[in-house]
Amino acid sequence: MSDNDELQQIAHLRREYTKGGLRRRDLPADPLTLFERWLSQACEAKLADPTAMVVATVDEHDQPYQRIVLLKHYDEKGMVFYTNLGSRKAHQIENNPRVSLLFPWHTLERQVMVIGKAERLSTLEVMKYFHSRPRDSQIGAWVSKQSSRISARGILESKFLELKQKFQQGEVPLPSFWGGFRVSLEQIEFWQGGEHRLHDRFLYQRENDAWKIDRLAP
């Protein structure tokens, strides 16, 4: 098969979106109410990693980067995730705290995008979550100098075994280079697939202490 033939096959991959629409009259005043409903439905549908979200950041050269992390908490203050503070994303957030999040719930023909500003969590918040993680995950946080180059996986595995022995007694301490971010809720867009590509999109935009809701063309 030539490259052109393969491209033609990819170009014809499509499906119809038939799971239902989203109407203005059905929208709650608070976007978190709708987000919670959709997240609950994603969990009930047994989607793989329903809390997985794409975090988009920009570096000092205006180059965008994306990666998938897990949502660990949300409320009216924002959406929370945790990471190595020496990671690429953490450095980029330090340089430019404006980020976007995307929840891609393909099976439900839905996606949610959040735009806001990321800020560091307090040490108390981070410590509380860190010690709720499985012990091996706590040790794993110590192992990796995230985004650095390594020659082989064996380096990580050896370090893990070394630290597992070191921390076999008592609590695993919180690494100073591990933390979390809360992304404020400035804009939240809900997308529901529709027939004939007439998708439903609604944008919640914060204005003072209220939310303005607009329908967007697909």
UniProtKB/Swiss-Prot annotation:
<feature type="binding site">
    <location>
        <position position="89"/>
    </location>
    <ligand>
        <name>FMN</name>
    </ligand>
</feature>
<feature type="binding site">
    <location>
        <begin position="14"/>
        <end position="17"/>
    </location>
    <ligand>
        <name>substrate</name>
    </ligand>
</feature>
<dbReference type="InterPro" id="IPR000659">
    <property type="entry name" value="Pyridox_Oxase"/>
</dbReference>
<dbReference type="InterPro" id="IPR019576">
    <property type="entry name" value="Pyridoxamine_oxidase_dimer_C"/>
</dbReference>
<feature type="binding site">
    <location>
        <position position="137"/>
    </location>
    <ligand>
        <name>substrate</name>
    </ligand>
</feature>
<protein>
    <recommendedName>
        <fullName>Pyridoxine/pyridoxamine 5'-phosphate oxidase</fullName>
        <ecNumber>1.4.3.5</ecNumber>
    </recommendedName>
</protein>
<keyword id="KW-0664">Pyridoxine biosynthesis</keyword>
<dbReference type="Pfam" id="PF10590">
    <property type="entry name" value="PNP_phzG_C"/>
</dbReference>
<comment type="similarity">
    <text>Belongs to the pyridoxamine 5'-phosphate oxidase family.</text>
</comment>
<feature type="binding site">
    <location>
        <begin position="146"/>
        <end position="147"/>
    </location>
    <ligand>
        <name>FMN</name>
    </ligand>
</feature>
<dbReference type="GO" id="GO:0008615">
    <property type="term" value="P:pyridoxine biosynthetic process"/>
</dbReference>
<feature type="binding site">
    <location>
        <position position="133"/>
    </location>
    <ligand>
        <name>substrate</name>
    </ligand>
</feature>
<dbReference type="InterPro" id="IPR012349">
    <property type="entry name" value="Split_barrel_FMN-bd"/>
</dbReference>
<feature type="binding site">
    <location>
        <position position="111"/>
    </location>
    <ligand>
        <name>FMN</name>
    </ligand>
</feature>
<dbReference type="GO" id="GO:0010181">
    <property type="term" value="F:FMN binding"/>
</dbReference>
<dbReference type="InterPro" id="IPR019740">
    <property type="entry name" value="Pyridox_Oxase_CS"/>
</dbReference>
<keyword id="KW-0560">Oxidoreductase</keyword>
<comment type="subunit">
    <text>Homodimer.</text>
</comment>
<dbReference type="Pfam" id="PF01243">
    <property type="entry name" value="PNPOx_N"/>
</dbReference>
<keyword id="KW-0288">FMN</keyword>
<feature type="binding site">
    <location>
        <position position="88"/>
    </location>
    <ligand>
        <name>FMN</name>
    </ligand>
</feature>
<feature type="binding site">
    <location>
        <begin position="197"/>
        <end position="199"/>
    </location>
    <ligand>
        <name>substrate</name>
    </ligand>
</feature>
<keyword id="KW-0285">Flavoprotein</keyword>
<feature type="binding site">
    <location>
        <position position="201"/>
    </location>
    <ligand>
        <name>FMN</name>
    </ligand>
</feature>
<comment type="pathway">
    <text>Cofactor metabolism; pyridoxal 5'-phosphate salvage; pyridoxal 5'-phosphate from pyridoxamine 5'-phosphate: step 1/1.</text>
</comment>
<comment type="pathway">
    <text>Cofactor metabolism; pyridoxal 5'-phosphate salvage; pyridoxal 5'-phosphate from pyridoxine 5'-phosphate: step 1/1.</text>
</comment>
<dbReference type="GO" id="GO:0004733">
    <property type="term" value="F:pyridoxamine phosphate oxidase activity"/>
</dbReference>
<dbReference type="InterPro" id="IPR011576">
    <property type="entry name" value="Pyridox_Oxase_N"/>
</dbReference>
<feature type="binding site">
    <location>
        <begin position="82"/>
        <end position="83"/>
    </location>
    <ligand>
        <name>FMN</name>
    </ligand>
</feature>
<feature type="binding site">
    <location>
        <position position="191"/>
    </location>
    <ligand>
        <name>FMN</name>
    </ligand>
</feature>
<feature type="binding site">
    <location>
        <begin position="67"/>
        <end position="72"/>
    </location>
    <ligand>
        <name>FMN</name>
    </ligand>
</feature>
<feature type="binding site">
    <location>
        <position position="129"/>
    </location>
    <ligand>
        <name>substrate</name>
    </ligand>
</feature>
<comment type="function">
    <text>Catalyzes the oxidation of either pyridoxine 5'-phosphate (PNP) or pyridoxamine 5'-phosphate (PMP) into pyridoxal 5'-phosphate (PLP).</text>
</comment>
<feature type="binding site">
    <location>
        <position position="72"/>
    </location>
    <ligand>
        <name>substrate</name>
    </ligand>
</feature>
